[in-house]
Amino acid sequence: MAVTWHKHENCGFVMLNNPPVNAINQKMREDLIDAVTWAESEGLERVILSGMGRSFAAGADTKEFDQPAISPHLPDVVNRIETSTVPWIAAIHGTALGGGGELALGCRYRIARADATIG
């Protein structure tokens, strides 16, 4: 899975996992939609979204640039996070660029390390 999730008590933890920089691809977008549905069905009080490894998410996966766009599209994923009944919190480290920045902005709250790059 490009995205993994688990819960501890009433808190969900969703982790982006597409090494080396968590580039956002179609599988990750699909998994994020599934994670939002999971969080709502579990009745969680909050979800913390973070990236495994050295980045939160460094933007779009360049391997998909020359291919036709496949649903779900990033704006649909961001909208699903924004409108979720469960508040999402982006825990940002490393880089959150392009689509990674959009994912972070789609969360209700954001917290970042002092050395994080968002753009």
Model-derived features: positions:
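Hydrophobic/aromatic residues within transmembrane alpha-helices
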Residues: 14, 49, 61, 103-104, ...
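A short, glycine- and basic residue-enriched loop/turn
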Residues: 21, 54, 59, 115-117
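Glycine-rich beta-to-alpha active-site loop
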Residues: 81-119
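Glycine- (often His-adjacent) and acidic-residue-rich active-site loop
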Residues: 50-80, 96
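Nucleotide phosphate-binding site architecture
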Residues: 22, 63-66, 119
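Conserved CoA-thioester-binding segment of acyl-CoA-metabolizing enzymes
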Residues: 1-52, 76-79
